[in-house]
Amino acid sequence: MKNNTMNTLIGAAQDESPVDLLVRNVRLVNVLSGEIHDAHIAVKDGIVVGFEEYEALHVVEGNGRHCIPGLIDGHIHIESTLLSPARFAAAAAPHGTAAVMCDPHEIANVMGAEGIEYMLHASAGLPLSVYVMMPSCVPATHMETAGATLRAEDVQDFLSRYPDRMPGLAEMMNYPGVLFRDDEVMAKLEAAASHVIDGHAPLLRGKALNAYVLGGPASDHETSDADEAREKLRKGMHLMIREGGSQEHNLEELVTVLNEFNTQNVSFVSDDKVVNDLMESGHMDDILRKAMAAGIPPVRAVQMASINTARYFRLHRRGAVAPGYRADFVLLDDLQTMRISECYLGGRNVKEIDFTGHSAAFSANTVHVAGLNTDSLHVAAGNGNLRVIGIVPGQVITHALELPPTLREGAAVADPSRDLAKLAVFERHKGTGNVGLGFTAGLGLHKGALAGTVSHDSHNLIVAGMDDADMITAAEEVQCIGGGLAVACDGRVLASLPLPIAGLMSDAPVEDVLAGLRGVNEALATLGYKLSSPFAALAFLSLAVIPSLKLTDKGLVDVHKFEIVPLWTA
């Protein structure tokens, strides 16, 4: 804070000049003292100056409403919303979100450093603060083809050039690389050693967890089991409770732990939140609603969505409502149900903020696919059973199934009667012609196909379907629109959604993106698709760092073995 600003604030706190805003008579959820008390909120130059009565240029009557700090999401991939940073901010701010810790490894896997620069530029100066964590694993594994590679020197470069925007290193997904002390992984950890280093350690326990923590990662958002959560908290990790889109729900399983332990090292995160979930259910407000309904006391719940996150990421004077803190706060008509009345960012009412002036141009075509034809989908009959990816509803983990094939004319084919769909991942960054083939159970498709360039983490072109020709039709539509989502059946495209920003996001108005996504979801519903957020489920079937079985453009990945395995068991 500059001296002239400090002088102004000190003077305003002593009634030397009117404050800009006074919100009178609120019940403040004080995340610093851990209580709820009466207060006025006085704001000058976007900063809280006191809880007392002040002369003000603008007065808002709180009328006893609860006031909570602006909420902070400790781990989100903005790209997963399908919205550009500015469009996302406009959609999230009315839900009480004041800041997010964004990991742009989705666009980084497509465009490398250029993609990170785009996210930094597109989010600069937004009223909703977007902090950008430096992606640690691009590509996520050696078993897939990404559009770029980021090395330790890139980590050093970005963290040194953007000290105020980039708190540290994003989720270190390559935990085997930490345990085996891979040279490049260790170099990245060393480059970020003085910064925050986020972890990513699903099911990691015991001595392996000890070794991982000693390497530098200090948090984890992949915990889905209560005993696992207890161990990670006892070993000093910052536990991020993930409650995001349709495939990421960990809160219910971990509530008992939150009521047993001191929660100062616990935060809530959304991770991946698709635009329809964001607009229909909310953002961090939705997580708080669920947390309090599950029995977590309101003050503790709010702390886990504000001050705990701010302290972990070393955000100065953020995450609370108190003198000297940025004036991000939310007025609630009802605390328990998180019924929001008004939101303020830097002392400005969100309803009066224009987010549209922050859009950044993007023109690159990032979809380059070779070999899109039905011949590329042929799976010749083999020996033994098929290794099949079994979808777990509501989770990003999958089961590794071994099932007998359905054969036709010497080839393994999809079988709607068994809920067995064919799955393909086409490399789309360099036109190599790579295609990985497999099968998945649990989509619920009766016919047709769906395709998209949103496929974690390398974001190649992923296609699932019951008919090879429909799979190619859907894939060709995605290529034609420059990336996005498409549904096809009986040789024609039923619906599609263009995502021209790296095949991941759109800068179209939120309402247009939402309408497009609803269109593809409705088209899928006519084909029998049964999962609540269709493309979110498909997008994670290629995520080769989450157990158990996944598919990349290089083939079927056994995540536990961390190697590519044959499609056939014998």
UniProtKB/Swiss-Prot annotation:
SUPFAM superfamilies: Composite domain of metallo-dependent hydrolases (SSF51338), Metallo-dependent hydrolases (SSF51556). Keywords: Hydrolase, Manganese. Pfam families: Adenine_deam_C, Amidohydro_1. InterPro entries: Adenine_deam, Adenine_deam_C, Amidohydro-rel, Metal-dep_hydrolase_composite, Metal_Hydrolase. GO terms for biological process: adenine catabolic process. Its cofactor is Mn(2+). Its EC number is 3.5.4.2. HAMAP family: Adenine_deamin (MF_01518). Belongs to the metallo-dependent hydrolases superfamily. Adenine deaminase family. This is Adenine deaminase. It comes from Oleidesulfovibrio alaskensis (strain ATCC BAA-1058 / DSM 17464 / G20). The gene is ade.
